[in-house]
Amino acid sequence: VICDVAAPIEVDEELTFDGPAPRRNAATLTALACADRVIALGEADVIGLPRLINLAREVQSRPDLFAPETDVQYWLNRSRREAAGFTPEAKMRDNWARYMQVPLTGVIPYERKVMDRLRRNGEALLEVASRHAVVQSLEAMLEGMYAVRPGA
């Protein structure tokens, strides 16, 4: 089962009620607690990278968020030269490593002109350019999602 949830993942413990009350993020927290694999996806730019780093720090500080055997992967999406310079993937990985000890699993590139052309022509990237860097990155993500873990 794949469940798409959005940040934030904080627990509303600071809210007090006279009785049980619904929590704003109850569905998100329940889905994460039941997950055997989590892919955290952030935007590869000056806003998205710090947000993903903050999320990763929150995950590290909250061992109760997932089962101990949960595989958590961190990916950056829409990596592009306009946002990060000539070698965007290398820069994103360097910036990630500067602040985080856990590995950045992958970076998905983005080429707006190519994507715009595909949408305009009603084409799928996999059909038109099956070896494109975006396709290879998404294949790597999917392989990681469905990889069998030792002992599972």
Give, region by region, the residue ranges found by the protein language model.
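Conserved C-terminal guanine-recognition region of P-loop GTPase G domains, centered on the G4
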Residues: 25, 49-72
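Beta-strand-loop-alpha "switch" segments that mediate conformational coupling across diverse proteins
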Residues: 78-81, 93-124
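An anion/phosphate-binding loop that grips the pyrophosphate of nucleotide cofactors and donors
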Residues: 35
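Short, well-ordered beta-strand core segments
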Residues: 1, 38-39
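G-domain G4 guanine-recognition motif of GTPases
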Residues: 42-44, 61-62, 70-87, 106-114
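NTP-binding/hydrolysis catalytic cores, primarily Walker-type P-loop NTPases
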Residues: 120-152
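Switch II (G3) loop of P-loop NTPases
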Residues: 1-27
